[in-house]
């Protein structure tokens, strides 16, 4: 039996020292206003996959069994104080923290503290399709299934009020890291029982209850989310503001102006065109770091003509990536050629792009029997993301590139939550999307985004290659990093050869904030956490 209290992920060291804006905090202000980029689809982290949703719930309202250190990738104890791992790597026994209180609100008054029943409810709801709560409120859990946890967790047992044992079918080298991600945020079993009794199970997604540093107060879509500092938080020194407010605006330029005017203290995803003005403002800080991210085009291989490799190859080599980098990222992006960033361990540096060659692309389309003037849809995100600061402009440039080879792309967009929902349903032909790493493990890219288990979730290409999938799953089932690297490199070559995606760029992440903000740290995972953050004069 191996005893663990803290483990370290094997991500490149360059990400471990994430950017920090800090000084000795001054007198704390009552309000911290965050100019956020979009409305969350809901407040139940298990249902979602985007940073917008996670910022609004997982990073505010909830905790998990394990957690990542602020601004880094090291895994620390969370609601579990410690854990034991069996010698065969298939059994994890978690020793739960005592004295942790769930939020008390006008819609729920807890009668007990956090215990093993809450862990069981959180995971059994995702595991069991016949779970009473899931039957009352049917929903999907994309991360849980995309990562194969629905198949790999054999059982969860309550050993006592503060001890829980997970038994896996296979070794999962990233299991502890996975539990620190947003999706397995611990829910209150008592609150769930109340909702079932009231016939309001869906309220778990609209009126969240957690153990986190901030208590949900109210939400007005496309306007604001309000939270109160949790005065009963189990780490009271980490709550340094009375009120946390998300001021929602999808326009990056408007967010920048609000920041400059002092209408908010922190924002995110600035337009590259606004960076110079933000840098020159004496009232602002503009910390940055290399993004652990990827912006890419996903081709839906279940739609014709994308089911043909030659078509995907043609579209890929017709993309003028350098022009996109220059116009869209404006010096804040690096060309991408692989399905994950170069700072991820196991990245294969031998993988190169096919040369930009519109003439050859035309030949490939002709060979595939694709007629001149064939129409397709190209979906563009309505919001700025860390990996794509201007999806509209990128889509217009791709539209122009593909027109040169006889493909007419119609640009389509939806509100962010609807965009993701429809894309998971496979309505798109090609789409702009991207990813910020979640846990420092290669499986979070190669399995979560391109694996067969993820075709109904984050695998927006709907691509499922048996050979590729076996390599990725075999890599996850061993803790030998050398063997894992070898398997992942083989998988990366298959991914490149089959072209379910066109990687575009890895961006530099900027986090503008006023100089009155103290101790905010940029997350390598593209999330925004506000515990331990204060606002001075």
UniProtKB/Swiss-Prot annotation:
Q: Which domain of life is it from?
A: Bacteria
- One GO location term (cellular component): ATP-binding cassette (ABC) transporter complex
Residues of the signal peptide: 1-29
* Molecular function GO labels: peptide transmembrane transporter activity
Identify the keywords attached in UniProt to this record, alphabetized.
Peptide transport, Protein transport, Signal, Transport
Q: Which InterPro entries match?
A: Peptide/Ni-bd (IPR030678), SBP_5 (IPR039424), SBP_5_CS (IPR023765), SBP_5_dom (IPR000914)
Q: Which GO terms describe its biological process?
A: dipeptide transport; protein transport
The record, for PROSITE patterns, names:
SBP_BACTERIAL_5 (PS01040)
- Pfam families in the record, alphabetically? SBP_bac_5
By sequence similarity, the record places it as follows: Belongs to the bacterial solute-binding protein 5 family.
Q: How does it assemble?
A: The complex is composed of two ATP-binding proteins (DppD and DppF), two transmembrane proteins (DppB and DppC) and a solute-binding protein (DppA1). Five orthologous SBPs (DppA1-A5) are present in P.aeruginosa, which increases the substrate specificity of the DppBCDF transporter.
Q: Which PANTHER family does this one have?
A: D,D-DIPEPTIDE-BINDING PERIPLASMIC PROTEIN DDPA-RELATED (PTHR30290:SF38), PERIPLASMIC BINDING COMPONENT OF ABC TRANSPORTER (PTHR30290)
Q: What does this protein do?
A: Part of the ABC transporter DppABCDF involved in the uptake of various di/tripeptides. Prefers dipeptides with acidic residues at the C-terminal end. Involved in the uptake of phaseolotoxin, a toxic tripeptide inhibiting the enzyme ornithine carbamoyltransferase.
Q: What is this protein called?
A: Di/tripeptide-binding protein 1
The protein's organism comes out as: Pseudomonas aeruginosa (strain UCBPP-PA14)
């Amino acid at each position: 039996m191996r005893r663990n209290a803290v483990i370290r992920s094997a991500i490149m060291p360059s990400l471990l020292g994430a950017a920090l804006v800090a000084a000795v905090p001054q007198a704390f202000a009552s309000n911290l206003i965050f100019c956020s980029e979009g409305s969350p689809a809901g407040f139940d982290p298990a249902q979602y996959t985007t940073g917008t949703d996670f910022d609004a719930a997982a990073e505010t309202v909830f905790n998990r069994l394990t957690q990542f250190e602020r601004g880094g990738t090291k895994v620390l104890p969370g609601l579990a104080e410690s854990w034991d791992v069996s010698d065969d790597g298939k059994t994890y026994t978690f020793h739960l923290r005592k004295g942790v209180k769930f939020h008390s609100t006008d819609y729920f008054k807890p009668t007990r503290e956090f215990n093993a029943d809450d862990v069981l409810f959180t995971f059994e709801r995702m595991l069991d399709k016949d779970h009473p709560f899931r039957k009352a409120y049917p929903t999907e859990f994309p991360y849980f299934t995309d990562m194969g946890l629905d198949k790999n967790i054999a059982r969860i047992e309550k050993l006592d009020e503060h001890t829980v044992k997970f038994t896996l079918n296979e070794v999962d080298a990233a299991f502890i890291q996975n539990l620190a991600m947003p999706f397995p945020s611990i829910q209150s079993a008592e609150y769930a029982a109340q909702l079932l009794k009231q016939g309001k199970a869906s309220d778990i997604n609209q009126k969240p209850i957690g153990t986190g540093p901030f208590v949900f107060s109210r939400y007005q879509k496309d306007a604001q989310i309000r939270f109160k500092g949790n005065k009963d938080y189990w780490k009271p020194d980490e709550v340094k503001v009375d009120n946390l407010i998300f001021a929602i605006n999808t326009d990056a330029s408007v967010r920048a102006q609000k920041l400059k005017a002092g209408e908010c203290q922190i924002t995110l995803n600035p337009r590259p065109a606004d960076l110079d003005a933000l840098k020159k403002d004496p009232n602002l800080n503009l910390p940055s770091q290399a993004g652990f991210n990827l912006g890419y085009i996903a081709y839906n291989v279940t739609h014709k003509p994308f089911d043909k490799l030659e078509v995907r190859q043609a579209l890929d080599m017709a993309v003028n990536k350098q022009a996109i980098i220059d116009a869209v990222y404006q010096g804040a992006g690096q060309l991408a050629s692989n399905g994950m960033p170069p700072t991820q361990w196991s990245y294969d540096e031998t993988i190169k792009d096919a040369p930009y060659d519109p003439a050859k692309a035309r030949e490939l389309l002709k060979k595939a029997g694709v007629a001149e003037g064939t129409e397709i849809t190209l979906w563009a995100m309505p919001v700025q993301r860390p990996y794509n600061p201007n999806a509209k402009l990128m889509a217009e440039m791709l539209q122009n590139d593909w027109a040169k080879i006889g493909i007419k792309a119609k640009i389509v967009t939806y509100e962010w939550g609807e965009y993701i929902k429809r894309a998971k349903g496979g309505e798109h032909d090609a789409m702009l999307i991207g990813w910020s790493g979640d846990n420092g493990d290669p499986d979070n890219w190669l399995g979560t985004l391109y694996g067969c288990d993820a075709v109904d979730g984050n695998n927006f290409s709907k691509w499922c290659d048996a050979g590729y999938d076996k390599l990725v799953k075999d890599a996850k089932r061993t803790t030998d990093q050398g063997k894992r690297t070898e398997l992942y490199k083989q998988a990366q070559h298959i991914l490149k050869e089959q072209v379910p995606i066109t990687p575009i760029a890895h961006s530099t992440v900027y986090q503008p904030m006023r100089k009155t903000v103290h101790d905010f740290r940029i997350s390598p995972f593209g999330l925004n956490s506000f515990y331990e953050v204060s606002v001075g004069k």
